[in-house]
C-alpha cells in the first residue's frame, strides 16, 4: 500500500491551530496543485463535533474561495481536527493562514443560518447534521489561540 504523508506526520509534535503545506504536485503540463493541512485543534487532545465541523466545511467552501485564488476543495479530516485544502498553484502558508483567519472571523461574527449553503436534502448528503452555533463557538475558540503559518512552532499571523 502506498505511504500517505499525513500518516507519517508526528501528530505529537505539531502545535495547532496552524497551516502546513503538505505537498505541491506538478502535472505533465506544468500545472501545480498544492495540498495544505488546515489544523484547527490539537490532534489527540480535542476534536470538533461533526455538526459543527460539517457547518464549518460548508462555510469554508465559499469563504475560502472569496479570499484565495484557485481553491479546488476543502475537506475535513476524519479525525475531526481540521481540513485538507487543495488549490491550483502555489500559495504561501501565510497567505493561506490569512484566508483561513478571515473565513473563521466571518463565521464567528457575521454568518447567519441563511448564509450556510447546502443545508437541505437536495444539496447535502447529511443535511440534518449541522450546527451554526457549534461552528461559531469553535471558530471563536480557534481564533482566540491564533493561527500559525508554521506547524511545529507558533508563528501566529
UniProtKB/Swiss-Prot annotation:
Cofactor binding, note field: Binds 1 Fe cation per subunit.
A Pfam family annotated for this UniProt entry: LuxS
Cofactor(s) required for function per UniProt: Fe cation
Reaction equation(s) it catalyzes: S-(5-deoxy-D-ribos-5-yl)-L-homocysteine = (S)-4,5-dihydroxypentane-2,3-dione + L-homocysteine
Residues where Fe cation binds: 54, 58, 124
GO terms assigned for molecular function: iron ion binding; S-ribosylhomocysteine lyase activity
Gene3D superfamilies: S-ribosylhomocysteinase (LuxS)
One GO term of the biological process aspect: quorum sensing
Summary of subunit composition and partner proteins: Homodimer.
The protein, known as: S-ribosylhomocysteine lyase
Organism expressing this protein natively: Lactobacillus helveticus (strain DPC 4571)
Organism classification: Bacteria, Bacillati, Bacillota, Bacilli, Lactobacillales
Originating gene: luxS
